[in-house]
Regions:
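Peripheral, non-transmembrane regulatory/ligand-interaction domains of membrane transport proteins
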Residues: 1-146
């Protein structure tokens, strides 16, 4: 599933679902890719010079693979806490940051992403750029860990 966060002319935000048959709207600042199917992966390949991140790449724990700059932008792999009953486990997310487009990839549902999407839908967060989205996700992660 691919969700897109768009910044509107009045600086409000909207979240919509994107299908591979549609062109990418020009006002998208965040593409959130959750468990993409083959058709979605093929569509995403058209947006990248490099390969779209695979689940095994996101699970690589080498510190040298957590951050790099490539032809598609800045690539960041980050571990997010996910609470399941009384347990907390780490779930990896991959981010590609471009000039004003953040593309996130995940293979699991992550409560912090759900929380940010809730804040966006209910205008409870001030976001003006793709970088703001990335920073807010990291901020929410720190809040949850503390």
């Amino acid at each position: 599933m691919i969700s897109a966060c768009l910044i509107n002319e009045d600086d409000s935000l909207s979240i919509i679902q994107i299908t591979p048959k549609e062109p990418l709207p020009s006002d998208v600042i965040w593409l959130d890719v959750n468990q993409p199917d083959d058709e979605e992966r093929q569509w995403l390949e058209t947006l990248f010079v490099e390969d779209v991140p695979e689940e095994d790449e996101m699970d690589d724990i080498e510190s040298s693979s957590r951050f790099r700059v490539g032809p598609d932008g800045v690539h960041i792999f980050s571990l997010f806490p996910q609470r399941l009953s009384n347990e907390t486990r780490g779930v990896n997310m991959s981010f590609t940051m471009r000039k004003n487009l953040l593309i996130s990839f995940r293979e699991d549902d992550i409560s912090i992403v759900r929380l940010l999407r809730y804040y966006i839908r209910h205008n409870k967060v001030e976001i003006r750029s793709a970088l703001d989205i990335l920073l807010k996700l990291q901020d929410l992660k720190v809040d949850q860990l503390s």
